[in-house]
C-alpha cells in the first residue's frame, strides 16, 4: 500500500522542485528579462569625439614690428608672463632707409584691384557684363567663365530632360506593341475556345475563324469513320465499338491539340506581360536648373566677397606699414601694451630682422582662478549636424598626470562655414569654461586634449536596435 504521508515529506518536495530548470534556467531567464527591461529605461550618451586645444577668449594686445633694423635685444619667449610696458624688442639705433614709394605703389595697385573686383560683383549681381574696358586683373574673364558655366549647365539639363522624354516615348511605344500582340494572342485563344466548344458540346464555328480549316478537317475524319461503318454489311457490335473508340480517340487527340495550342498562346501572353511590367517610364526630369544656377552665382559672389575681404585686409596692412614707415626712429623699441601671457608667432622666433608692420606676438589674458578660456576643436563636416550651441563639452588634457585633468564647457559658437584641411572640411567649435584654482598648475594656452561633446541620449534598447539595423545616430 502507498503511504500518503510520504507526500508531505520534505524529501519529496526537495526532489520535485530542486531540479535543473529551477536552479539554472529560471535564474538565467529572469536575468535575461531583467537585462531587456533595463535597456528600455537606461540611457546612453551620444557623443562626438575630437581633438581640441585651450585658447584665449580674447586677445589683449597684438604686437607688431616697428622697425626693420637688426634686433639687438630680444625678450620674446612663448608663454612668458609680461607686465605692461615691459621691453620686448630693441632695434639697432640706425634707422634703415626703406622705399616708401614702393608701399604707395602697392597701395595703388590694391585700390585698382578693388575697383575691378567691384565691377565683377556688379556683373554677377546684374547677370550682365559691367566692365567698360578690359581689366588687367582677369576679373572680366572670371565673369565670362561664369557665364560659360551657366550656359553649359542649361545645355546639360536640357539634354538630360530630352533623353528622359525620349526614353518615356520609347517605353510607351514598346508597351503599345506588346499590348497589341497580347490582344492578337487573346483573340487566337478565343478562336481555339470556339472550336473546342464546338467539338465538346456541338456548338457552331464562325466562318471568319482562322482555324476553321482544322475544325473542318476533324469533322471530315469523323465523317470518314462513320461512312466506313455504314459501308459494312450488317456490322456486328464489335465493329461498332471499334468505330466509336476511334471517334473518341480522334476527338481526344483533336481537343488535346487545341489545349496545347491554347497553353502555348497563354505562355506567350504571360511572357509579354512580364516584358511589359519591366518597361517603366522615368520621372527623373531635372528641375534643378534655377537652384544650380543660383548656387553657381552664390559661390562666385562668395569667392569675390572673400577676395574683397582679403584686399581690404591687405590695404589695411599697407596703410599701417606706410604709417609706420613715416615715423621717426622713435620706434626703435617695442613694449608690452598690456599685462598678460605672451604668445610669439611661430615664424618670428630666431629672426634677426623683422620687416616693419609684421605681426610678431599676441598677449593673452593671465590665467588665474575663474579665467574664461575657449575649448576650441574642429569637427568634421560628417559629424557636425548633431552639434548645437549650448551643448556640454568635456575636455581631457592629454598629459601624464596622476589624475586626469577634465574641463567642462558650454558651446558658445559654431562657425557657419567649414575650414579646409588636407583630411577634409571641418567646422570650428568654441566652448567656454572657467578655470578653477585647483586646475591652474596643469593648464596652459595651446594645451591639446580630447574633446567629447554630448549631443543627445537614447535608451540602450534603441541604441542596440540602431546598431543591428545599420542606422547611424
UniProtKB/Swiss-Prot annotation:
It comes from the Bacteria. Its main location: membrane. The keyword Transmembrane helix applies. The keyword Oxidoreductase does not apply. The chain crosses the membrane at residues 22-44. It is found in: Cell membrane. InterPro entries: MesE/LcnD, MFP, Secretion_HlyD_CS. Residues 1-21 are cytoplasmic. GO terms for biological process: bacteriocin transport; protein secretion. Keywords: Bacteriocin transport, Cell membrane, Membrane, Protein transport, Transmembrane, Transmembrane helix, Transport. Residues 45-473 are extracellular. Coiled coil: none annotated. One of its GO terms (cellular component) is plasma membrane. Pfam families: HlyD_3. It is a single-pass type II membrane protein. Belongs to the membrane fusion protein (MFP) (TC 8.A.1) family. Involved in the secretion of a lactococcin. This is Lactococcin A secretion protein LcnD-like. It comes from Lactococcus lactis subsp. lactis (strain IL1403).
Amino acid at each position: 500500500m502507498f503511504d500518503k504521508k510520504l507526500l508531505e515529506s520534505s524529501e519529496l518536495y526537495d526532489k520535485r522542485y530542486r531540479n535543473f530548470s529551477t536552479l539554472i534556467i529560471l535564474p538565467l531567464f529572469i536575468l535575461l528579462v531583467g537585462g531587456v527591461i533595463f535597456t528600455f529605461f537606461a540611457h546612453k550618451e551620444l557623443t562626438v569625439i575630437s581633438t581640441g586645444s585651450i585658447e584665449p577668449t580674447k586677445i589683449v594686445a597684438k604686437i607688431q614690428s616697428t622697425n626693420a633694423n637688426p634686433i639687438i635685444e630680444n625678450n620674446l619667449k612663448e608663454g612668458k608672463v609680461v607686465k605692461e610696458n615691459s621691453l620686448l624688442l630693441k632695434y639697432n639705433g640706425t634707422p634703415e632707409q626703406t622705399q616708401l614709394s614702393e608701399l604707395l605703389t602697392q597701395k595703388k595697385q590694391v585700390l585698382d584691384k578693388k575697383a575691378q573686383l567691384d565691377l565683377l560683383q556688379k556683373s554677377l549681381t546684374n547677370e550682365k557684363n559691367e566692365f567698360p574696358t578690359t581689366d588687367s586683373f582677369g576679373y572680366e574673364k572670371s565673369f565670362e567663365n561664369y557665364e560659360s558655366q551657366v550656359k553649359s549647365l542649361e545645355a546639360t539639363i536640357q539634354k538630360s530632360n530630352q533623353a528622359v522624354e525620349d526614353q518615356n516615348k520609347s517605353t510607351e511605344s514598346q508597351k503599345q506593341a506588346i499590348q497589341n500582340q497580347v490582344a492578337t494572342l487573346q483573340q487566337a485563344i478565343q478562336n481555339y475556345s470556339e472550336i473546342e466548344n464546338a467539338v465538346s458540346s456541338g456548338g457552331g464555328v464562325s466562318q471568319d475563324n482562322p482555324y476553321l480549316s482544322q475544325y473542318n478537317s476533324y469533322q471530315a475524319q469523323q465523317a470518314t469513320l462513320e461512312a466506313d461503318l455504314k459501308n459494312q454489311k450488317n456490322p456486328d457490335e464489335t465493329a461498332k465499338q471499334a468505330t466509336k473508340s476511334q471517334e473518341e480517340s480522334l476527338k481526344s487527340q483533336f481537343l488535346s491539340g487545341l489545349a496545347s495550342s491554347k497553353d502555348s498562346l497563354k505562355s506567350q501572353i504571360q511572357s509579354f506581360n512580364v516584358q511589359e511590367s519591366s518597361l517603366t517610364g522615368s520621372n527623373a526630369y531635372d528641375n534643378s536648373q534655377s537652384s544650380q544656377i543660383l548656387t553657381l552665382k552664390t559661390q562666385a559672389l562668395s569667392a569675390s566677397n572673400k577676395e574683397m575681404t582679403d584686399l581690404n585686409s591687405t590695404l589695411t596692412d599697407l596703410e599701417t606699414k606706410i604709417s609706420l614707415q613715416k615715423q621717426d626712429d622713435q620706434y626703435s623699441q617695442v613694449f608690452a601694451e598690456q599685462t598678460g601671457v605672451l604668445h610669439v608667432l611661430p615664424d618670428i622666433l630666431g629672426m634677426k630682422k623683422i620687416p616693419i608692420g609684421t605681426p610678431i606676438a599676441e598677449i593673452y589674458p593671465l590665467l588665474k582662478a575663474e579665467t574664461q578660456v575657449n575649448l576650441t576643436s574642429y569637427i568634421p563636416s560628417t559629424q557636425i549636424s548633431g552639434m548645437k550651441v549650448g551643448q556640454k563639452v568635456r575636455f581631457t588634457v592629454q598629459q601624464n598626470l596622476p589624475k586626469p585633468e577634465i574641463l567642462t564647457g558650454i558651446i558658445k559658437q559654431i562657425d557657419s562655414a567649414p575650414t579646409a584641411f588636407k583630411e577634409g572640411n571641418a567646422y570650428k567649435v568654441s566652448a567656454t569654461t572657467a578655470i578653477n584654482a585647483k586646475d591652474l598648475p596643469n593648464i596652459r594656452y595651446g594645451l591639446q586634449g580630447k574633446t567629447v561633446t554630448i549631443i543627445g541620449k537614447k535608451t540602450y534598447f534603441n541604441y542596440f536596435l540602431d546598431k543591428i539595423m545599420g542606422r547611424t545616430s
